Amino acid sequence: MTANRILLAVVPMLMMIAIALALPGIEQWLASFGKTAEAKLTLGRIGLSLPYIASAAIGLIFLLSAQGSVNIKTAGWGVAAGSGAVIAIAVVREGMRLSQFAGQVPAARSILSYVDPATMTGTATALFSGMFALRVAVIGNAAFSRSEPKRIRGKRALHGEAEWLKLPEAGKLFAEDGGIVVGERYRVDRDSTAALSFRADMPETWGAGGKSPLLCFDGSFGSSHGIVFAGSGGFKTTSVTIPTALKWGGTLIVLDPSNEVAPMVKAHRIKAGRDVIVLDPKDPDIGFNALDWIGQHGGTKQEDIAAVASWIMSESGRASGVRDDFFRASGLQLLTAIIADVCLSGHTEKKNQTLRTVRMNLSEPEPKLRARLQEIYDNSESDFVKENVAAFVNMTPETFSGVYANAIKETHWLSYPNYAGLVSGSTFSTDDIASGKTDVFVALDLKTLETHGGLARVIIGSFLNAIYNRDGAMPGRALFLLDEVARLGFMRILETARDAGRKYGITLLMIYQSIGQMRETYGGRDATSKWFESASWISFSAINDPETADYISRRCGTTTVEIDQVSRSFQARGSSRTRSKQLASRPLIQPHEVLRMRADEQIVFTGGNAPLRCGRAMWFRRADMKSCVGDNRFHGKRGPLDMKV
């Protein structure tokens, strides 16, 4: 216990006791001010109750002065103890007074009928002060009234009656046995620490966070997909990725740019009987063949090859120029032809049918590559390969150079042995993903995602298609938890999974820093409507963008509030005051209130339900999660957090 907390607990108690002990006898001094017998009697009785009333007033003043303090609960306990002591002093004094003539009381009357009314009044005041102090000690700053307009519901709600989803209803919607952690079932804005800023290194600012029941999603309604928006440093990994990785029981694919999640949850998932694989460029010996799923489970090889080529080639959700479209489309066709030659022509051994071989065949000098294309056209056993190669056999050198440069640029990351090893290995196969027992953590850092986005697209796309081609024939569901998903760029396969993934056992949980990231990736303002329409739930937290705050405010709806108006008029004959009430429209939450939300608070939208305002499930606040989590390689660099947590 710190010195401040000791002072907050001891000082009000000592002050209240001191006043209760020092003021008795003041009734004679007060009575001397009376001019008549009645006045002296009244002032004397006021003096009898004054020590206890003054003690109660001191306690209340102390609580009001400490309002907003981190240790307000400690002050509440101190005032409650002081009130108890004052009541005890009053009872002892009155008991001693009554004991002096207890033997003279008639048998028909009770000794309690002689209790002094003034003392009873003072004691009752101290009792009420103690009850309020106990309320403060239990719920902290939430015990004080909040300044907000009176909301109107029912027939008088002319401007709307939007309201927050009630927590019991939220508990039914997001049952605790679900696998995707959405948040915690408590209202941060009504918590004891609502007036304080959230600090991860100060447990006294956490309030009910970490002690409340979880809100979890089981994929039972909607598309089963979720989208999370939280700014940089907004505890995305802490409150979404790690808790979900601890709780999800099925196949889990995590895009982990910080390589932070896998070391923390790997041991827990292995204990749960899961096979955990970490794809890390620093360990290229662990990898899979990104082409091993082609043509399996009813899919055509030609379509699957075209899909792989499209992941390697970067694509934008926005319209581009005709020249750019031509060279991109031609480069895509050339890459498709080379991949098809490796997989379909029949001259490449099965074990060598990898993207590394594709890059080796493609990265030849132009004259040699043109000769290879002619040879492929003449000798390939596949009509599909011949038809795709035919366009390049007699292409003019200038045009072919542009197409060749485009294809080389998009596949240059395959020249890095550590990157090529991840998608050309044999440690596991994509069939393992669909078996329902394997988890994969894709630990590509932000620099790699920014420079070589095709690598992540190939990995995620291969896993998605391996499940998609099975037509839903897999145990349970596979969760693709994609942190920093904007770094993947535009992926049409994600749009396919968004629209039809539920049928095939695919659930997406995508984490963005802002709505702007989504719009930039998927093509302007229409992107939000496409993705929001297909999401079962959408979470917003740690918002710093006024435009996003305005969107949240509008989506939450409006309420009807009652406003008191007072008008005064002054005339020669006197003055008058008129008081009236009127109804006005007010947003359920205003944009500036969204921007001022605590970092551990979020707003969750679901289709057909009121917006949910709740807490966030940060793993370091929950004892059940802390016991399962391994070491975080970043916490040692953050100072107080790893000492307090």
Model region roles, listed by residue range:
Residues D189-L215, G317-F326, H347-T348, I563-Q582:
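Low-complexity, polar-biased intrinsically disordered regions enriched in Pro/Ser/Thr/Gly
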Residues F132-V181, Y186-T193, D304, S310-I312, ...:
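Short alpha-helical interface patches
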Residues G82-A85, R498-A500, Y504-I603:
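Conserved ATP-driven motor cores of ASCE-family P-loop NTPases powering translocation/secretion/packaging/pilus
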Residues G209-G210, F217-S223, I227-I506, A584, ...:
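P-loop NTPase motor domains
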Residues T2-L14, A18-T241, Q582, K644:
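Basic- and hydrophobic-enriched, low-structure N-terminal and domain-boundary segments
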Residues M131, G183, G346, A456, ...:
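Glycine-centered flexibility motif
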